[in-house]
Amino acid sequence: IGWCDWSSDVCSSDLAQAHEEFRHAMKFYDFINERGGQAVLAAIEAPPAEWNSPQAVFEGVRDHERKVTRGINELVDLAAAERDHATSAFLQWFVTEQVEEEASAEDLVHKIGMVGQHPHGLYMLDRELGKRKVDGD
């Protein structure tokens, strides 16, 4: 039985999160094309499929959000150096979004740290995550 077969609330939330991330990518795609560029979609490295512990999963999420933030900050710096005000304005939405994403990831690392490997705590955290609301942008 797969994860989505027995945990439909969490799976639904994860799929909604995936759609949100796709919409974020499309913002970049559309912006580049609207500005006369040609956005090219390339393959990205798959995330790890195996983790040593639930703690490691959430730490991986947090580390990934930090990596995304660094990339966005580099783009902001480049736009400023190029005096590209339209791109700077466009990127501010992502700067703000990453503050929220990093805070959320850090909160999850903290919660899983409190729960540890206790099955009841993991179950309750899983239920909480399944009830998350995902922004529609």
What kind of feature is each model-predicted range?
Residues 33-38, 112-120:
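Alpha-helix capping/hinge segments and adjacent helical runs
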Residues 119-137:
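Acidic/histidine-enriched, glycine/proline-rich intrinsically disordered or flexible terminal extensions
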Residues 1-10:
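Single conserved hydrophobic/aromatic residue that forms the stacking wall/gate
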Residues 11-17:
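Loop-to-helix transition at the N-terminal end of transmembrane alpha-helices
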Residues 41-43, 76-87, 116-125:
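Long amphipathic alpha-helical coiled-coil segments
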Residues 16, 30, 46-111, 137:
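Acidic/histidine-rich alpha-helical segments that form the ligand environment
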